[in-house]
Design a protein with these regions (language model features):
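Acidic, surface-exposed loops and disordered segments
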Residues: 1-167
Length: 167
């Protein structure tokens, strides 16, 4: 993949992309908690921090998380040692009024998370191809939360193990 940048931007942004070849190598708790902590420092309206994470890094939770993925994503994401479901609280904690910025703020948190991961040599790939209704039921997510994405997190793997259409 060749990308041409017209301006001088942060190297982390230049280097970041969403590969599909994952190694099964475990991610250390220190690295995992650091990338989650980076997300916690994302800017948000009234510092609400509406994002919520459901972390799957053990086999039982990974199996559950994989079961919500559509087959196209499951083909490659099944090797990722961590899957992270991201949801956004739709109302403010203070007054239960609608937070019109919940998705914008949650996207900012995802961006911070992905850049911290990149800095640590960890790859991330956000997916839209999963069953939101199944996720809501399996993980008991209330209607006050909007399910945003599932993110594969891990180390870069062997691209030759992917089918040609996924390379």
């Amino acid at each position: 993949m060749t990308r041409i940048f017209k301006h001088d931007i942060l190297p982390l942004i230049k280097e970041r992309w969403s590969p599909r070849a994952y190694s099964e190598e475990k991610i250390s708790k220190d690295d995992l908690y650091a990338i989650l902590e980076a997300a916690s420092y994302a800017l948000s309206c009234f510092n609400e921090q509406p994002w919520r994470f459901i972390l799957a890094d053990d086999e039982k939770t990974l199996t559950k998380m994989r079961s919500i993925l559509y087959s196209g994503n499951l083909q490659w994401a099944q090797k990722a040692p961590v899957l992270l479901l991201i949801a956004a609280k739709k109302t403010f904690s203070l007054n239960n009024e609608e937070n019109f910025w919940h998705m914008f703020d949650t996207g900012t948190a995802w961006g911070f998370l992905s850049l911290e991961a990149q800095k640590r040599g960890i790859i991330t790939h956000a997916m839209g191809g999963f069953s939101m209704s199944k996720a809501r039921k399996l993980f008991k997510i209330s209607d006050d939360y909007e399910i945003v994405t599932v993110v594969a997190i891990g180390r870069y793997g062997d691209i030759s193990q992917l089918s040609d259409d996924l390379k």
